[in-house]
Amino acid sequence: MSKNNKTTEPTAPQALTAQFSEQIIDERLTPNPLSQFSMDKDALRLALVTAQYALRATRQQTPPILNKPTGLLVLVNGMEQAGKGTAVKQLRQWVDPRLLKVEATVGDCPLAYQPIWQAHTKALPRHGDVMVYFGNWYADLLYNVMRMATSDNDNANVNANDNVNDNVNDNKEQSKNLKSKSTKSDNDKALPIAQWQAYLQQQLIKLQAFEQDLAANQTRLLKCWFHVDIETLQARLNDDEADPQFLYQIDWNSKKVIETFNQVATVLLRQQDDWIIIDGDNKSDAADHFCHEVLQAMQTALMSSKKNTVNTSDKSKAKKQAQQALKSAKFEPVKIPKCLKNIDDAEIDKSEYRDALVEKQVRLAQLLRARKGRHIVFAFEGMDAAGKGGAIKRLVAPLDPRDYQIYNISAPMLYELQHPYLWRFWTKLPNEQTDRISRIAIFDRTWYGRVLVERIEGFATDEEWQRAYDEINRFEADLAAAGTIVIKYWLAIDKKEQLKRFEARQETPHKQFKLTDDDWRNRDKWSDYVQSAADMLARTDTEYAPWCVIATNEKRQARLDVLDHAIKQLSAVCGS
């Protein structure tokens, strides 16, 4: 099976100069929009609350409308004392505060074994809502980068008493900071590429991809970077009481720290051109500017919501779309591999099975203990009655029940549909903040439903499920890059054996609950599911998250094969 590795390669880092370039901020600073347009504050306030209610109203909950409203996530970052709090306070006063969600972080060390964005996904707004998020994943990133950058410097131990006030006169030009253009000296020597710079650029590539996936799934982002010059910053720091929770947990009184932060900000803003930079020297003007940017973003989200509202009352049209999916000019189905057609049904002796099962379960438990806290995600997919539940039962038998969580994935709930598609899986991943013990997640059906049942039943558009292959690959690549072990299974069964198991379930009272009308309906579309599975395996079998196809006509052997593959994967990572 071919391996897909479509992760974006980072561009070569650019060396920073010894003299901090102020041009990036200066060129990107935008004037207060209220000075450009004939909109006073009263008009802006009315427009904001009107747009807020109009956006909320797009979130329809009744059929037959397939409604895909857009949510708005406002990321607020930048310098300390730059007017961020004042701006968000004004926004909340001008809109209906009950409908505006606000979250805040100051930045902390990214959690072990999970992508930098993962800890923040539960806070994402529902479609049709607006949320302001201070700090967010960029605060965690900047916190980590600043720690690396200060340790990279020759003077790693920054003198906390090296106050900006001591050097204001000597640094008059730099005190104007980031708003007046500076000319680089011909003798200005380039610094070598620092470790923190390469790390930052790599993380920004991943975050940009994550944010693009959010936008493609009806969550629009507005990214606002608040900037203030050094003299104003120092004056505000002197006026306010000391804050033990300074943004990014750095000492904003230190000249060296600010110089380092400016270098970090330069790399970030060079690489990402979607930040709105707001001049925070005048807090009132900054608040007006911020509110205007939020208004424009809400209006754009509103237009997107209306565009995405599709009338699906004509069921025959939706069915026809699903039938024509395989004929899409943008998508070429793959040839169905033998492992999905020729299912091995070799039997194993019952006593031999029991001995092997115990041996493999003991070995699996040893490897899981040796993984030293690394997160593990087991993903089970397969045809109905292929034995996912039985395989999972044997997989967890040797484990402490506190060590793992099992998620039985079915049709999404309404609130889950009001978030990006992958959101309901992001929020179930092992989390260092909440999962003190259970850092193993086992999914009985997974995020691959988008390219299986949703594709076949027409619950996702052609564009959505075809795009999902790359989205899923990026998701799993981020998990693997963070140190999470991803183990994926496709349990293969033939049509004859499936019918045999369906009939057995019908005749067994304590198993009748396992058989539903959907199971029979899915069976009628057997060939569609086999083709979709083949396409899925071909497009999402990667080096960092490979598929393992298990023949399950013979249940006992299948359960042993599931354990064998887990042992093999964990041995490669944790040692033999």
Regions found by a protein language model. Give the residues of each.
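Glycine-rich phosphate-binding loop of ATP-dependent small-molecule kinases
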Residues: S2-S576
